[in-house]
């Protein structure tokens, strides 16, 4: 499906609010029968993206290409009788080789998080992705880098780049930054970079505490 604006995209998804994921899966099967969903940890995102005809893929470009919008899930969980984000949001793996020659303005990370439409859904305590059909889609929340913490995220990225350029990628820690984290990724695989140096695989992420504040400020206002 092609959308002419982010407003149109958000309006489309609003029609599915308060529906459980099983109902949404049935919608996809009726309207996009060619899409085959994979029951793995990414199943919730697959179901929600399939509502616009997106099949599971590994394309590094934004999911809604003409609008430059990335689609990501934001699971929510009850805490003190309120719903809050359950975890950080992983963006993409840090490429220790390509970051050496990138500038912030042309970086792939900046392009990737320019705009993110988060899919909000409740994942009750004690439930795992295997219970996905019971989860309820609650709506969307738009993250716009130009509006939301741009300079902090830019500085966090520059600090990550500085460590990699100094051949200190092995010292990266999520605690080093304010918003954009360098979190552990995968099984801790060792990555080689700049010829001689090694560090454990890490991914860019929007940190958990930041997402909680972002959600409370933007969605709850």
Segments and roles (model prediction):
Residues 1-65, 70-221:
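Nucleic-acid endonuclease domains
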């Amino acid at each position: 499906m092609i959308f002419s604006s982010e407003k149109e995209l958000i309006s489309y998804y609003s029609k599915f609010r308060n529906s459980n994921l099983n109902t949404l899966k049935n919608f996809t099967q009726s309207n996009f029968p060619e899409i085959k969903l994979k029951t793995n940890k990414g199943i919730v995102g697959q179901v929600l993206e399939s509502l616009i005809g997106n099949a599971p893929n590994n394309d590094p470009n934004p999911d809604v290409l003409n609008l430059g919008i990335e689609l990501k899930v934001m699971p929510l969980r009850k805490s003190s009788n309120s719903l809050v984000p359950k975890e950080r949001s992983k963006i993409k793996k840090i490429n220790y080789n390509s970051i050496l020659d990138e500038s912030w303005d042309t970086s792939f990370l900046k392009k990737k998080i320019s705009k993110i439409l988060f899919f909000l859904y409740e994942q009750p305590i004690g439930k795992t992705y295997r219970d996905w059909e019971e989860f309820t889609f609650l709506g969307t929340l738009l993250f716009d880098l130009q509006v939301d913490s741009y300079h902090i995220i830019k500085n966090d990225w520059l600090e990550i780049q500085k460590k990699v350029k100094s051949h200190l990628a092995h010292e990266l820690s999520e605690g080093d930054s304010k918003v954009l984290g360098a979190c552990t990724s995968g099984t801790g695989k060792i990555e080689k970079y700049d010829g001689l140096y090694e560090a454990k695989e890490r991914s860019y992420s929007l940190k958990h505490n930041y997402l909680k504040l972002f959600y409370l400020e933007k969605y709850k206002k």
